[in-house]
């Protein structure tokens, strides 16, 4: 059992916090998933970052670039500003946060409102940088069975 503090900023032990999700347990909400993804960047867990991205987008991720950015950065902290959950099936959410890090070019901060979708009991990050080929009347990328225009289109 790890005695290290979780990098997400909760103050809890890693194993009792994000490490639980890194080990395969589903995050109970979008905020927990977002925090666990930040921790995964800190810890270099590229497989986890890919696995928690919307499955239809996973092939478009640059695993090498993710790993390099993770390894070349000193992570300075995470601040979750807000979380907004929208009902419906599937459930969607926005999480607004600021992440800070230092790399060879200096100190940086990034503020973002990320989109998430829950499907089959798991939350997924919807990556706005990964282009997807889907028509408005096609089945949604998240696997809900709904048309894309009625489901995730407004979150991309």
UniProtKB/Swiss-Prot annotation:
Report the domain of life of the source organism: Bacteria
For this protein, the parts annotated as crossing the membrane are: none
Q: Which InterPro entries match?
A: NTF2-like_dom_sf, SEC_C_motif, UPF0225, YchJ-like_M
NCBIfam families, from UniProt?
PRK00183.1 (NF001213), PRK01617.1 (NF002449), PRK01752.1 (NF002486)
Q: Which PANTHER family does the protein's record reference?
A: ADENYLATE CYCLASE-ASSOCIATED CAP C-TERMINAL DOMAIN-CONTAINING PROTEIN (PTHR33747:SF1), UPF0225 PROTEIN SCO1677 (PTHR33747)
Q: Which family does it belong to?
A: Belongs to the UPF0225 family.
What is this protein called in UniProt?
UPF0225 protein PFLU_1319
């Amino acid at each position: 059992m790890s005695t290290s503090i979780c990098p997400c900023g909760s103050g809890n032990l890693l194993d009792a916090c994000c490490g639980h999700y890194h080990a395969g347990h589903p995050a109970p909400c979008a905020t927990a998933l977002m925090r666990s993804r930040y921790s995964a960047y800190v810890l270099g867990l590229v497989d986890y970052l890919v696995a928690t991205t919307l499955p239809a987008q996973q092939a478009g991720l640059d695993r090498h670039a993710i790993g390099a950015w993770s390894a070349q950065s000193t992570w300075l902290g995470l601040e979750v500003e807000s979380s907004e959950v929208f009902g419906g099936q599937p459930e969607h959410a926005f999480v607004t946060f600021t992440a800070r890090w230092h790399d060879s070019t200096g100190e940086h901060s990034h503020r973002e409102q990320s989109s998430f979708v829950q499907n089959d009991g798991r939350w997924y990050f919807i990556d706005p940088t990964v282009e997807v080929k889907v028509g408005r009347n096609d089945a949604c990328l998240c696997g809900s069975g709904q048309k894309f225009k009625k489901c995730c289109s407004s979150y991309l």
